[in-house]
């Protein structure tokens, strides 16, 4: 995406709408938003209404399109969870979007992917600083989040990809060469 014919999506010719997810702190109410019902100014934290679904996000995006006067989407593009949103666009509003570009996504999670997601969630919840979701924003559960992200990064790659990226064989050769040069 860029300005010019060499880009797959030329921003001179296309109107791009990029919408953040519901409950993300970057543009909508989220668990870190101040809860108006709490007199002490504390955030929603664990009291934030859940769950929020892919379909909920698409419905809000459609309302935004209506508000902007957009009558049709030429293309819905998304990576990972964004590809699930694009698929939901096609399922919920089939006459509203013409084309889909799905990057690293799926229409349905496998049992393995659901299990990985739960393990990641539990690693955050097991962090002593999580405190049932009522953690101190100045001292969040970083260790649990770091563990969750490590698990996620591994789950995004096939074993061969990890082997190529970290290439333990090369490291063993370096260690052997270092040991023989002493």
Task: Identify the role of each PLM range.
Residues 96, 102-182:
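Alpha/beta-hydrolase-fold enzymes
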Residues 1-84, 91, 95-107, 112-118:
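Gly/Pro-rich cap/lid or specificity-loop segments adjacent to the active site
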């Amino acid at each position: 995406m860029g300005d010019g014919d060499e880009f797959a999506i030329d921003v001179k010719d296309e109107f791009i709408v990029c919408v953040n997810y519901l409950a993300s702190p970057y543009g909508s109410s989220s668990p870190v938003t101040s809860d108006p019902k709490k007199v002490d100014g504390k955030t929603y934290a664990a009291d934030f209404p859940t769950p929020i679904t892919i379909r909920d996000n698409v419905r809000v995006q459609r309302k935004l399109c209506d508000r902007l006067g957009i009558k049709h989407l030429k293309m819905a593009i998304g990576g990972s969870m964004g590809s699930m949103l694009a698929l939901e666009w096609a399922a919920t509003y089939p006459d509203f979007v013409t084309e889909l570009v799905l990057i690293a996504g799926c229409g349905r999670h496998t049992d393995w992917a659901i299990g990985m997601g739960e393990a990641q969630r539990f690693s955050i919840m097991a962090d002593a600083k999580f405190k049932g979701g009522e953690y101190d924003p100045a001292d969040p559960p970083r260790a649990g989040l770091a563990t969750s992200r490590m698990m996620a990064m591994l789950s995004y790659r096939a074993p061969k990809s990890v082997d190529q990226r970290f290439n333990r064989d090369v490291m063993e050769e370096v260690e052997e060469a270092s040991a023989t040069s002493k």
